[in-house]
Amino acid sequence: MNARLEGLGITPQVLLDVFDTPVSFHRCLVPVTGGVTSALMLSQAIWTTQSLEPCADGWFIRSQEQWTQETGLSRWEQETARRALRRSGLLEERRVGMPARLWFRVRPDAVWRALQAHAGASYR
């Protein structure tokens, strides 16, 4: 590591503590979803779906706070991304229970069709 940074007390461990856990997403979803924010949210939803039991039928619960913790997206960024994903048919939502909790489900068939359409348009 740079001696100047170490002289300031900035060690690799300090950087890891400050930077926290990185957030990744599937870049191929950016043109399909219309932006990085929506691509990040859809990527996180796809990742979450992979660990579900078959009986869940693809549905999972996420609170606004959980989305923020997992992705770093603010409430307004989440709402904008969710709206875009719903409109494009890539993500379904439903409210269930009292008090109502928000459930999500990725539509893999719609994601696949959107990826194919984008790939086809890229090679024309």
Language model features with spans:
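Short alpha-helical interface patches
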Residues: 27-32, 90, 108-116
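Long, compositionally biased, intrinsically disordered segments
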Residues: 18, 35, 93, 116-123
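Short, exposed beta-strand "edge-strand" segments with a Pro/Gly-rich flavor and a Y/T-containing core
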Residues: 19-24, 99-107
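Winged helix-turn-helix DNA-binding recognition segment
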Residues: 49-105
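Short recognition helix of helix-turn-helix/winged-helix DNA-binding domains
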Residues: 1-66
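Charged low-complexity intrinsically disordered patches
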Residues: 1-14, 108-124
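Generic beta-structure capping elements
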Residues: 44, 96, 107-109
